[in-house]
């Protein structure tokens, strides 16, 4: 029965970092810590990686 606890703990530790990379950026602080800017429409050299709290203000990062 202890092997179940060990397996559960191992899977929890193994899969927990993946959740951080799948979250959507939805505030200005997270956008800026990822090296991006909050802007209306993204310029051509940038790509959208999220939004900055409002659907019209996008989080744009250079390609």
Swiss-Prot record:
Exhibits antimicrobial activity against Gram-negative bacteria and Gram-positive bacteria. May act as a ligand for C-C chemokine receptor CCR6. Can bind to mouse (but not human) CCR6 and induce chemotactic activity of CCR6-expressing cells. Coiled coil: none annotated. GO terms for biological process: chemotaxis; defense response to bacterium; defense response to Gram-negative bacterium; defense response to Gram-positive bacterium. Pfam families: Defensin_beta. InterPro entries: Defensin_beta-like. Belongs to the beta-defensin family. The modification Pyrrolidone carboxylic acid is found at residue 23. Residues 1-22 form the signal peptide. It is found in: Secreted. GO terms for molecular function: CCR6 chemokine receptor binding. GO terms for cellular component: extracellular space. The lineage of its organism: Eukaryota, Metazoa, Chordata, Craniata, Vertebrata. This is Beta-defensin 4. Its main location: secreted. Tongue, esophagus and trachea.
């Amino acid at each position: 029965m202890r092997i179940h606890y060990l397996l559960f703990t191992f899977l929890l530790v193994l899969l927990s970092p993946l959740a951080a990379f799948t979250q959507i950026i939805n505030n200005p602080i997270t956008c800026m810590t990822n090296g991006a800017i909050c802007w209306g429409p993204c310029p051509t050299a940038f790509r959208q990686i999220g939004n900055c709290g409002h659907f019209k203000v996008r989080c744009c990062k250079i390609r």
